[in-house]
Amino acid sequence: MMKRLHPLRIQVHLKSDYPLFTFEQLLSTNGIRRGQTARISLKDYIEWQNFPNIMKRENFFTQRKPVTTTAKEEPFSFDNILDCEPQFSKCLAKWLLVNYKLNDYPYYDLNIVNIYTDLPQAIQICKNLMSYLKSTLSDNMFQKIKYFMVPLYKCDKIPSKLLDGIPGSVSLVQDYPVSPYFLQKKFHIEDPIQILMLNDVIKYTTHDLVRYSSDDKGWQQCFVDINKNGQKSKSFDSAIDYSCELALEQMFNDRSHVSPGKELYIPTKLIEILMTIKNNIPEHRLFIVDTPQRSSPTIISLLKSLISPRPTGSSQIVQPYSDSIFSDKRSGRICFMTDFLQLQNIYNGINSSSSSCEVEDVADFVEKWISPSERSTLSSQNGNRPQLEDIKNSSLAVLHST
């Protein structure tokens, strides 16, 4: 059961006298002007820094630049879900259809909401998925499918002609982005909704940097302080904001496994989204694909895990170049690789007994849902590298409702 939040402390005893800005305030004021001072939580600062580089109108032939991790100064390329197409979309369509027939048919439509940041990718997957369903379903059944494409951030004036050639009822939702609209508005959807985040959302959900203070006997949140000359500095404060405290409550209900002083990135924005989905769309099913944080456990660590619970770790930050958070350059995107097993625990904790999810590799998911005829076709492609090999070698993972 989810732990009840304690009343928040009034944030009047900040160590900095700089005015506090949120991401929404930075958007409305177009940032911090020269000569102006500001204090911004690190998660809001990263979101502000990322924002111009996420919802771009990229075409289908845009080549993304590799980024580097802070741990190693070497290129790090994320796997592309389109390398698994169209087979992945066929398997996803089967998963959606089976769950729909088992749980919601014939009383409800099959409502699919794809939250996206990469519009060309979202359109391609939608086209593959809807084309497959069109080819396998009766007209009456196919008409019950309603597909909605919802941006993570506002993306204006998307031409509807981009949907030409996609069969069925497909809508581009432009006026109601997930952030900040859905996270701030009061609404309730009673119909069952299938929510997709397909390899272009989780890595861009901003994180808080936190640490547990033995002196304060409590958590501290990281802030970025900007002086009149535009110089930036990092500081930690025990006066944490609401969304950070919400994330901490979900992740660390047992502090016995917290290492004092250790800095951890926690998925604040993602937890906020999952909480909003749970409260406002209770009859939902979730399907997430992304690059997870993976570890190579030693024999000693495996033996320890049998004795004591697995400690909650930090997400891995991935930057365009070293220390790009505090640089004046704004040409790249800061990403995070999150431990999917921790996300599974977080999701199951938020939804308690009402809903649960499980984690598996993309290759295992496709293996469950591919048909023998599809396997035969993909295994013998004319002179090309078989797509099943690409899927088998993919580092992508799936977190989906059970």
Swiss-Prot record:
GO terms for cellular component: mitochondrion. One of its GO terms (biological process) is methylation. One of its GO terms (molecular function) is protein-arginine omega-N symmetric methyltransferase activity. Keywords: Methyltransferase, Mitochondrion, Transferase. Pfam families: Methyltransf_28. InterPro entries: NDUFAF7. It is an enzyme of class 2 (transferase). Its EC number is 2.1.1.320. Its main location: mitochondrion. It is found in: Mitochondrion. It catalyses: L-arginyl-[protein] + 2 S-adenosyl-L-methionine = N(omega),N(omega)'-dimethyl-L-arginyl-[protein] + 2 S-adenosyl-L-homocysteine + 2 H(+). Arginine methyltransferase involved in the assembly or stability of mitochondrial NADH:ubiquinone oxidoreductase complex (complex I). PANTHER family: PROTEIN ARGININE METHYLTRANSFERASE NDUFAF7 HOMOLOG, MITOCHONDRIAL, PROTEIN ARGININE METHYLTRANSFERASE NDUFAF7, MITOCHONDRIAL. Present with 1100 molecules/cell in log phase SD medium. Belongs to the NDUFAF7 family. This is Protein arginine methyltransferase NDUFAF7 homolog, mitochondrial. The lineage of its organism: Eukaryota, Fungi, Dikarya, Ascomycota, Saccharomycotina.
